[in-house]
Amino acid sequence: MSLLSRIKRSRRTLSLVTALPAALAGMWIAAPSAQAAGLPTPDHVIVVVFENHSYEQVIGSTSAPYLNNTLKAGGGNLTNSFAITHPSQPNYLDLFSGNNQGITNDNCYTPQFSSAANLGSELIAAGKTWGSYNEGLPSEGSTVCTNSATKYARKHNPWFAFSNVPLNTAHTFTQFPTDYTTLPKVSFVVPNLCNDMHDCSITTGDNWLKNNLGAYATWAQTHNSILAVTFDEDDSSHSNHIATVFYGAHVAPGSSTSTHYNHYDVLRTLEDLAGLTTHAGAAANASDIAGIWN
């Protein structure tokens, strides 16, 4: 072999050795976002959304003893959590898809008008399970706008906006599992217009939360499951400052964070807790919630 040939071969070998660490680094960067962020990997996450009350009206209030004395005291409190806008409906869309999808009011829209990415479609595409439990929904998959008899309003159920979220994943609340091990990877629970504190008192909503999800919350602590409780918006009196509390396995009891978070950050965190590597809408540039995990 000539001297020139040996030099060329040495250069190729050096290039390969140099490229290998870079390739390995690329594999690390592409690892699931939940691992990169140091988040836990729960089997299930349930999100409950209440209505139209500010952080100041809820946190520390004697009208919400369960939320404060059990969930907040035993979980993680986001002291600087904010909604995105007013009124209700665009906030739900922001929380579910990282974008209001052009909806800026509470008017009834054509069901499944959007094919944009969202939490439900991302979970399904990744082979994971998704579901919603909608109190007052007349029947599974119903796209009715309202039902006065059951105090139901579709404006609080954003999954109906998306053609890539099957209607049969929108369950009635009576279908909420009694065997919690069968829960979807991520699910939303939406109370009706009274129990979500929209038309009725904070105490009404707090009692509903305890009576309907208290047993699950207790179970979650020892079964790799997490409950998140948040609000769509405030009452327009406190700059959209809202209560957001996490509770269950992996959540440090009595923890809190003063970092500024909003619905996009909550969505990003839900995606990453589920081990997704995709992020819908503004969640792509949002931050994972930190400071409350064990």
Predicted feature residues:
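Secretory targeting and sorting signals
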Residues: 2-36
